[in-house]
Amino acid sequence: MSTNSGTEYLCRENHPWAAGVAAGCVACLLALSGCATHGTSRTGRGLPKSAYPVTPQTNVVETLHGVRVADPYRWLEDENAPATKAWVEAENKVTFAYLAGIPEREAIQRRLTQLWNYERYGVPVKQGGRYFFSKNDGLQNQSVLYVAESLDAAPRVLLDPNTLSKDGTVALSGTAISDDGQRLAYGVAVAGSDWQEWRVRDVATAQDLPDVIKWVKFSGASWTKDGQGFFYSRYDEPTEAQRLTKVNYFQKLYFHKLGTAQAEDVLVYERPDQKEWGFSGGVTDDGRYLVITVSQGTDPKNRVFYKDLQAPGAKVVELLNDFDASYNFIDNDGPVFWFQTDLDAPRGRVIAIDTRAPARRNWKELIPQAAETIQGVSAVNQQFFVNYLKDAHTQVKVFDLGGRFVREIPLPSLGSAGGFSGKRSDTETFYSFTSFNTPGVIFRYDATAATSTVFRQPKVAFNPDDYETRQVFYASKDGTRIPMFISHKKGLKLDGRTPTLLYGYGGFNISLTPSFSVANLVWMEMGGVYAMPNLRGGGEYGEEWHQAGTKARKQNVFDDFVAAAEWLIANGYTTRARLAISGGSNGGLLVGACMTQRPDLFGACLPAVGVMDMLRFHKFTIGWAWTSDYGSPDNAEDFKALLAYSPLQNLRPGTRYPATLITTADHDDRVVPAHSFKFAARLQACQRGANPVLIRIETRAGHGAGKPTTKLIEEAADKLGFLVKTLRMSVKPPE
C-alpha cells in the first residue's frame, strides 16, 4: 500500500542510548582502551546543594479525587516565561560546567566521533523502476536521500536535508514516492518538533514544486495511482504561544491535488464527535481503494474504513467499526483485504476479509497464530513475508497467498531484521540486519531464487568478533520469566564489580530487539557491560505481554526492571554502586519510578525525555493519547495507581538518591520538557548527600527524531563521561 507512516504519537525516544543506530566506520586508531578498573576518579564526583540554582516554590495545591496534591514547580510548565528561560540557562550552566570538568570526556567524544564516521545506508525502496535510499557519509548531521535509475547506475542526490539549516536541526520527517517514481512528497521538521511541513519535489530535476502543506503531525502521505495528488492528515493551526504545548485533538484527513493551494485541499474524513480519533489514509497498490486506519491514542486497537476511489461519489465504508483488536492492512486482491490482526490471537495471525461479504463469519484465516509473535507482514512476489519475534530476536518466514509455509529466510545471527517492502508483483525486496555488535547490513533478497546477497555492508573501525552477546532469563517479582540480552567484550573478567548499564523501556507494545549503537559500543570498549531486558508492557510476546504492563499493572514493568538489576548483582556482574540505569520517554518514566522506589539499588540514573508527572501528562500536546497504557488521572481508580508510582510525586525529602543526569530538550512537543524541569527541581531539593543531580537541556531539539549527528555525539559523550565519573571508572587515555 502506498503510504508513508501512520499515527506515530507513541511515547517513544530516539537518542544515543536507544539501541538502533545502524553503524560502521572508516579505519581509525583506538582512542579508548577497555580498562574499567576500580580506582577512584581523579576528581570529586559530588555537588553540594549550594551548587544548584535556587528554584522558587509556589503555593499550588489541588485536590484530586479527595487527595491534596502540591505542585510547587508548576510555573516551570510555561516554557516561554522569562523565569523559566532563566532557570534553564542557570541549570545548563551548572550541568555543562560539571561535564566539561570530567577529564575523560574529551577522549570519549573523540572516540565516538571516530566510530560514528562511517557510511550508513537505509533500506532501498523501488518505485517506477527507480531505487530510492538514504545514505549518511559518516558525520553528516542528516542522512541524504538518493535515487538511482537501476541497481548498477550511479546514484544522484535527490534531497539533502543538510542544506536546509546551518546547524542540522531541520530534518527529513517522512517521505512518500508516487507510484511512477516521478514525484517525491517529503516532510520536514524543525528543531525536533512533531509538527511537519510537507513539500513536493520533482524526481527528474530534484527541484521543488510550489506545493506546501502545513500543520501536519503524526501523519505520512499516500499518493493516488495517477500521481496527481496525495492524502494526508493534519490538525487545525495553533497559536504561536501554544505550538509546543496545546493539546492535539480533532485530526482530519485531507486530499491535496498537485498545483493547488492547501486552502483548496479536500476534506475526506473527520469526526467532530470523536476528538481523540486519528486517521491514516493509504492508497492500495492497485489504486482502487483508500484504506483509512482509525486510531484512538496509542491503543493498538483500531478501526478500518475504506473508500472506493474508482466509484464517483463513493462514501466512506466502515468495514471494521469496533476498537476490539489491531488490524494492520497488508494488501488487497480486488475486493478481498488482507490484515494482520491480534483478534483471538494475541501473538498475531493473517486473515482475509471480502468487502462484498464482510460479516465476521465469512472471514478466512490464512496464517494462524504461532508460538512466535508477528511484528509485521508484507506481500512481495505473490507471497507473504512475515517478520516474527522469537524471544525478542527476528525470524522471517515466507508463505504463499493461501497461507502455506514456503521457507524461512536465514539470518546471519541472533539479531533484528526489517524491511521486506515492495509490491506483490516485485521479484526482489531489501532488508537490513543488525545486532549489538553488527552495524546495519543491507541485503537484497531475490524472491525467485530465494537467495539473499549483501547489498551494502559498512566498513567498521572495530572488530565485531571482539564482542559477545548472551540471552538469559530471570524471574521477576511475581515469578514471570523475563528475557534479557547481555553484551560485553569477550574475555571480560566478571569480578562482581564491572560497570554495568541497564537499559529498558517496557510500554506501548514496543519491542526492544538487538541493534547496534555507537554509544553502547564505546561503553563496552571501556570495559562496561550492556544489559537490555524485555519488560512487560512491550510487544515482544504479543498483546497479553503488552497488557500485563499497562494501567493498574504498570508496576509489573518496574518490578521486572528491578529484578533485572538484582539478577545482575546476584550473578556476579556488578555491584549497586557500579550499576547505572537508562531509558528515554516511557523509559525515562521507568528510570524515574525505579530510582524513587529503590534509590539504594543504583549508582547512576539517566532518565531521558521522561514522563515524570503522571498526574498532568494528559494536559499537554498528545499526552492524552497515552491513557491507553497509563490510564487517566481523571479516573479515580487510575489516579490511585498513577499516584503510587509517579516519579515527581514520589520523591521524598532527605533521601540519598543516585547520581542523576536528566536529559530533555527545549522543543520537545511530545513529552514536554516541563516533566523533566519539575522532576529536576524537586530532586535537587530532596537530595541528601553530594550525589549530583543535573539536568541537561538541549536547545533547538525535540523528542529525539531527526537530532543532528553533532548533537547525538555530544550528548553521548556527556552521558558516558558522567558514568565514568560517578561509577568511579578509570579510562585509559588515547595513545
Label each residue range with its predicted role.
Residues 519, 526, 532-735:
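Active-site-proximal cap/loop segments of hydrolase catalytic domains
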Residues 147-148, 199-203, 247-259, 304-309, ...:
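Beta-propeller blade signature
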Residues 32-34:
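C-terminal motif of bacterial Sec signal peptides marking the signal peptidase cleavage site
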Residues 162-178, 186-193, 204-210, 404, ...:
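Cap/lid segment of the alpha/beta-hydrolase catalytic domain
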Residues 129, 180-182, 226-228, 288, ...:
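Short coil/turn segments that connect the beta-strands within blades of beta-propeller domains
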Residues 136-143, 165-170, 188-197, 212-217, ...:
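A flexible loop/linker signature enriched in serine peptidases of the S9 family
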Residues 82-176, 187, 277-308, 313-332, ...:
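Non-catalytic accessory segments flanking enzyme active sites
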Residues 36-38:
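Bacterial signal peptide processing site
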